[in-house]
């Protein structure tokens, strides 16, 4: 008997292929379509998307025949626990999706972080719950890169106090992690006439060289060579607190560290100790340290942090990441595409 191959995304056994007798093909296809059409996609955002981004997400979701549910500006965890109870897909920004949230999401199949970083998702718990976790790499990389360059200008021109500063032209810029953001930083920095170096253990030298960037082969080598380092590493068990006094001590006089990555990668106690010893060093970031108040008091004219994460806070990045998240959800539910999956 000829068999009908049926790819099942909705049953929680993603990736399995089911064989259904020929005479069942028509009724099964109808059943499958009905299930897909009844799916719910929740957008849960403490910091909401721009309205134009929500409109774009809604269009993608509803064109696929799904229902869009919004939970915006929520203030209590209980609100998201209740909202995820009956949804099939979840879009978040910096919102935390931990084991408790996943426990409450009884029929959740996929969660997408609209942005590059995904340390706000408990990946092990997602895997345990058979939930696919994704990010949307590259969608906000230009926004983050532009902010990083703006922070460099702020630091070297002494906008803290309005005194005379220096120019970026001719300075040695080190890019720590040469991914989507790092590559955009390099592209923009070329326009300033900077000498550009990069260290990324996972990026071939040939890629950097083809883009006019000099590859270096250790973080210590990068920090020792450069006047300014732009930090773009993710927060992982290997990188947390890895930017420490020993590494920073390699940097030349008048050095600047720009962090638009994650605060967890900085060893805060050692950063403070280093800045107390090195009066020439400046630190600029869009991820406020836990010791922000202390650092403001100690280093008023050498330290700046934005009140909240600002790298992706542009209208363009907002729209790009939100719509990309919606498209990835539809592609996953319909076609089983796991291209941007970050858990195993």
Model-assigned labels for residue ranges:
Residues 44-48, 72, 94, 260, ...:
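Structural motif
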Residues 129-191, 206, 332, 337-343:
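Phosphate-binding beta-alpha-beta segment of Rossmann-like dinucleotide-binding domains, i.e.
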Residues 99-102, 203-297, 313:
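Rossmann-like adenosine-cofactor binding region
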Residues 31-40, 45, 52-56, 63, ...:
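C-terminal helix-to-coil terminal segments
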Residues 5-11, 18, 22, 28-87, ...:
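N-terminal glycine-/charge-rich "phosphate-binding" loop or analogous flexible N-terminal tail
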Residues 69, 88-165, 267:
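Phosphate/diphosphate ligand-binding glycine-rich loop within oxidoreductases
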Residues 38, 108, 169-172, 245, ...:
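Phosphate-coordination loops involved in phosphoryl transfer and adenosine-cofactor binding
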Residues 191-209:
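NAD(P)-binding Rossmann-fold cofactor-contacting core
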């Amino acid at each position: 008997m000829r068999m009908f191959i049926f790819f099942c995304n909705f049953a929680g056994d993603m990736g399995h292929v089911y064989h259904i007798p020929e005479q069942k093909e028509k009724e099964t296809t109808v059943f499958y379509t009905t299930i897909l059409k009844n799916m719910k996609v929740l957008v849960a955002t403490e910091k909401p998307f721009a309205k134009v981004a929500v409109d774009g997400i809604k269009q993608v979701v509803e064109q696929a025949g799904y229902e869009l549910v919004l939970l915006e500006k929520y203030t209590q965890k209980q609100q998201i626990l209740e909202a995820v109870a009956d949804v099939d897909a979840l879009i978040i920004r910096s919102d935390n999706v931990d084991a408790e949230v996943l426990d409450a999401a009884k029929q959740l199949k996929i969660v997408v972080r609209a942005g590059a970083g995904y340390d706000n998702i408990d990946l092990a718990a997602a895997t345990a719950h058979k939930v696919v976790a994704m990010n949307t790499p590259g969608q906000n990389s230009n926004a983050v890169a532009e902010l990083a360059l703006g922070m460099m200008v702020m630091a070297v021109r002494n906008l803290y106090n309005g005194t005379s500063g220096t120019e970026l032209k001719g300075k040695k810029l080190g890019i720590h992690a040469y991914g989507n953001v790092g590559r955009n930083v390099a592209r923009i920095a070329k326009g300033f006439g900077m000498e550009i170096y990069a260290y990324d253990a996972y990026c071939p030298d040939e890629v950097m060289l083809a883009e006019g960037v000099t590859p270096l082969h250790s973080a210590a080598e990068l920090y020792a060579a450069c006047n300014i380092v732009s930090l773009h590493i993710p927060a992982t068990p290997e990188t947390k607190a890895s930017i420490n006094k020993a590494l920073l001590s390699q940097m030349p006089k008048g050095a600047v560290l720009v962090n638009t990555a994650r605060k967890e990668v900085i060893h805060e106690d050692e950063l403070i100790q280093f800045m107390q010893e090195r009066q020439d060093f400046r630190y600029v970031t869009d991820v406020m340290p836990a010791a922000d108040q202390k650092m403001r008091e100690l280093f008023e004219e050498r330290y700046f942090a934005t009140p909240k994460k600002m790298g992706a806070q542009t209208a363009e990045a907002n729209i790009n990441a939100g719509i990309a998240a919606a498209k990835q959800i539809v592609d996953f539910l319909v076609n089983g595409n796991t291209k941007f999956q970050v858990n195993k």
